[in-house]
Amino acid sequence: TPVEFEVDTHFTEFGRAHNIVINEDSGYAYVVGSNGSPFNGGPIFINIQNPTEPILEGGFGEEGYSHDAQVVTYYGPDSDYTGKEILIGSNEDKVVIADVSDKSNPVTISNIDYSNISYTHQGWFTEDLRYFIVGDELDEQFIGTNTRTLIFDFNDLDNPSLSFEYFSDNTSIDHNGY
């Protein structure tokens, strides 16, 4: 028999979204891929520390539309940001690094692009937070490369760099590989 759930609350501060990213350490949800938001399609910050009473606390529109993101409480190699809440946005034509610790004043740390950009779709930190692995969803289709994974060196969040590219031996579109 199927289980039927009862609604605890209905949050109406945004319409559709591509994804909702949650940082369990901070108790915040980040809505990404939501065109038509007051933040130019950038992440929307929702306090879900009390899940039945979510609170809209702001957003980050400075770098434009974020299709996907990862948000972590940072304990990586860059000591300038230890303990800060860091958002890495896959923003269609670049990767954005932002400090979102202060929800009323998010700050761009840096951003980085790469050659043959088609659609910066998603990415994920390595466990040690030294590297960020990116999938460009449409480069195989529009540029004609084999499936490409980009590995960025994030040892210094102010100065990220492309470490290397990995090409597989097929031409599959890499959608949500990480």
Where is each model-derived feature located?
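Feature marking well-ordered beta-strand scaffolds used for ligand recognition
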Residues: 1-178
